[in-house]
């Protein structure tokens, strides 16, 4: 084990001893606190039970005194209860109500301290039966939503029970008894007290929603209640909802009630931890001093040895720059001096080897690089020569083809020139025809516009004709109406003439003529109406047909505009084609002259290229010989480079 580990082991032993001391102190203090709390809580429960006894005794004494006094007066129940009202009113925090019930007259009354009410005697017979054979009776119940403990005492007159007197002890959160039990019964900050009947029913709890519940339903009190019923251990520890709790019980002397005082152990132990904090701080300071003394005395030696071990490790890995310093007169200093001498001797030897290896490596690298470059250049030159030779051969073949092609181009250029001239003449004819077509389309457009105007006017005439037919129809209806009225008048006139006898005969002839004229007018109007009906039908057909014609004219007008637009575009494109044909003709004439000159020049170039090809064939054979020699030199240089790299690898392990 190294010295450093031994030092740390010693420190760990010291710290472990301190921790063990802390634990023993904590256990001792915790046990002392628990014993002290147990004793204090038992005394607290006894004191609380005495308080409950005094409270219950006071209530029972008041009830008995009232029963004794009232039993000798032969009062009616209402009058008895009216006297109890003052007692309830003065002690609201103790009493919730009072009542009396008399058996001989079946009367009963109740007071809450504010008023007295007559009540049904039958509702209180249960109390009379419950107190039979007893001098006092307690009944837990709820009065107007308030939990109470009802105390019932019999009224005796001349050794005969004539009724009962009862008081309801207030058990709500506002009552003195609740505050005393819950607040004074807490064994810790979050604890509380309980008042429970002998059959396990809860009378007082910090949450009065648990009133009259079985104490076993609350959780955690089962063991304490069993000990109370059996008269066993008064201090009970248990775990509830993951927390350690304790409960102390005490029986209320003279009554079948139990007081339970409960609290949380953790809250009490927290107080104990505060008490032991000073002792723990003292131990911590003492341990810190010991730790500091060990650290100051041992760490310099450990640090020096670690430094030397690190230097030896680096020296063994080849780092010759390590310097061993010999300071002091101890054994560690002698080791440092021996290491220093060995390092100097080895360093001189390695430096010489490194320098020789560097020179050899540099020379071999230069030879290798030069030979590789020479070999690569030879290979590249050979490849380039092949490419040039291939290109020259290709060029010679291409020049031959180009020469024949140029001659063909010259002949074709002349043909193209003639063709373009013919094409120019024909395109001009097409242009002329397109212009004439455009003019005719525009003329057709004018005619279509006139037709459209005529159609619009015809549409207006038809509308006027329809309106006139409607007017005539209205006039005919008027005439028909007049004819009917005239016929009616003629009929009336004939009737009057008949009444007048001979004097009215001339008038009857006139009336008959008027009637005939009216009938003819009626027939004429009917004929006119039939003709108008036929005319209207014809007009409707004409109007429907004219609508279709108008729509067709509109479509023709739109299509005429579109055709005119397309003709104009065609004319523009034809003019562009004419311009391109003229340019092509001029270019063809120029290319014909140039092609003849190119054919002559290409013959001369072909001859020169053939001479170059012969020279390249001779140069290729020379380059192949040079490439073979360069490859041999490169192989020898590569072998020398490998040997120098091996030597460099060996000496690189050392750092000087």
Swiss-Prot record:
The keyword Transport does not apply. InterPro entries: dCache_1, HAMP_dom, MCP_chemotaxis, MCPsignal_dom. It is a multi-pass membrane protein. One of its GO terms (molecular function) is transmembrane signaling receptor activity. The modification Glutamate methyl ester (Glu) is found at residues 401, 407, 590, 596. Residues 370-606 form the Methyl-accepting transducer domain. Keywords: Cell membrane, Chemotaxis, Membrane, Methylation, Transducer, Transmembrane, Transmembrane helix. The keyword Magnesium does not apply. SUPFAM superfamilies: Methyl-accepting chemotaxis protein (MCP) signaling domain (SSF58104). GO terms for cellular component: plasma membrane. It is found in: Cell membrane. GO terms for biological process: chemotaxis; signal transduction. Pfam families: dCache_1, HAMP, MCPsignal. Residues 299-351 form the HAMP domain. CDD domains: HAMP (cd06225), MCP_signal (cd11386), PDC2_MCP_like (cd12912). The chain crosses the membrane at residues 6-26, 276-296. Its main location: membrane. Belongs to the methyl-accepting chemotaxis (MCP) protein family. Chemotactic-signal transducers respond to changes in the concentration of attractants and repellents in the environment, transduce a signal from the outside to the inside of the cell, and facilitate sensory adaptation through the variation of the level of methylation. This is Methyl-accepting chemotaxis protein 1. It comes from Thermotoga maritima (strain ATCC 43589 / DSM 3109 / JCM 10099 / NBRC 100826 / MSB8).
């Amino acid at each position: 084990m190294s010295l450093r580990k031994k030092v740390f082991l010693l420190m760990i032993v010291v710290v472990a001893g301190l921790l063990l001391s802390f634990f023993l102190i904590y256990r001792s203090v915790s046990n002392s606190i628990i014993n002290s709390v147990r004793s204090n809580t038992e005394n607290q429960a006894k004191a609380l039970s005495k308080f409950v006894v005094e409270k219950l005794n006071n209530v029972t004494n008041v009830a008995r005194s009232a029963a004794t006094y009232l039993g000798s007066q032969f009062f009616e129940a209402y009058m008895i209860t009216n006297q109890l009202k003052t007692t309830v009113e003065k002690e609201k925090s103790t009493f919730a109500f009072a009542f009396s019930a008399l058996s001989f007259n079946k009367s009963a009354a109740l007071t809450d301290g504010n008023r007295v009410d007559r009540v049904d005697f039958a509702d209180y017979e249960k109390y009379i039966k419950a107190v039979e054979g007893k001098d006092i009776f307690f009944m837990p119940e709820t009065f107007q939503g308030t939990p109470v403990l009802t105390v019932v005492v019999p009224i005796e007159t001349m050794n005969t029970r004539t009724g009962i007197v009862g008081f309801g002890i207030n058990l709500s959160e506002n009552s003195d008894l609740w505050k005393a039990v819950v607040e004074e019964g807490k064994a810790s900050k979050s604890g509380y007290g309980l008042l429970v009947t002998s059959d396990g029913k809860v009378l007082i709890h910090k949450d009065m929603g648990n009133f009259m519940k079985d104490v076993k339903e609350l959780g955690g009190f089962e063991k304490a209640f069993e000990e109370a019923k059996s008269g066993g251990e008064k201090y009970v520890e248990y775990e509830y909802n993951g927390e350690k709790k304790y409960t102390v019980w005490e029986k209320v002397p003279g009554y079948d009630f139990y007081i339970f005082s409960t609290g949380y152990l953790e809250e009490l132990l927290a107080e104990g931890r505060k008490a032991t904090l000073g002792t723990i701080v003292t131990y911590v300071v003492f341990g810190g001093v010991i730790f500091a003394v060990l650290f100051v005395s041992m760490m310099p030696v450990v640090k020096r040895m670690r430094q030397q071990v690190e230097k030896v490790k680096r020296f063994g890995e080849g780092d010759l720059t390590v310097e061993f310093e010999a300071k002091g007169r101890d054994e560690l200093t002698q080791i440092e001096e021996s290491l220093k001498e060995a390092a100097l001797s080895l360093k001189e030897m390695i430096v010489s080897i490194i320098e020789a290896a560097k020179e050899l490596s540099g020379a071999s690298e230069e030879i290798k690089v030069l030979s590789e470059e020479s070999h690569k250049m030879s290979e590249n030159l050979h490849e380039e020569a092949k490419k040039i030779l291939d290109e020259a051969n290709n060029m010679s073949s291409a020049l031959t083809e180009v020469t024949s092609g140029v001659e063909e181009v010259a002949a074709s250029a002349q043909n193209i020139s003639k063709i373009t001239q013919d094409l120019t003449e024909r395109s001009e004819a097409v242009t002329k025809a397109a212009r004439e077509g455009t003019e005719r389309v525009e003329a057709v457009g004018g005619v279509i516009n006139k037709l459209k105007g005529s159609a619009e006017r015809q549409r207006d005439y038809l509308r006027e004709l329809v309106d006139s037919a409607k007017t005539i129809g209205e006039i005919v209806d008027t005439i028909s109406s007049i004819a009917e009225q005239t016929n009616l008048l003629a009929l009336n006139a004939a009737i009057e003439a008949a009444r007048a006898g001979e004097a009215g005969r001339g008038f009857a002839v006139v009336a008959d003529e008027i009637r005939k004229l009216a009938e003819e007018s009626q027939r004429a109007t009917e004929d006119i109406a039939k003709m108008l009906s036929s005319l209207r039908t014809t007009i409707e057909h004409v109007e429907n047909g004219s609508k279709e014609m108008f729509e067709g004219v509109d479509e023709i007008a739109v299509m005429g505009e579109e055709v005119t637009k397309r003709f104009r575009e065609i004319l523009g494109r034809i003019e562009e084609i004419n311009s391109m044909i003229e340019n092509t003709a001029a270019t063809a004439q120029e290319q014909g002259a140039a092609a003849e000159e190119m054919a002559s020049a290409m013959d001369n170039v072909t001859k020169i290229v053939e001479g170059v090809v012969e020279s390249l064939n001779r140069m290729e054979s020379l380059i192949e010989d040079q490439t073979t020699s360069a490859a041999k030199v490169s192989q020898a240089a590569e072998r020398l480079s490998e040997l120098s790299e091996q030597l460099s690898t060996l000496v690189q392990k050392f750092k000087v």
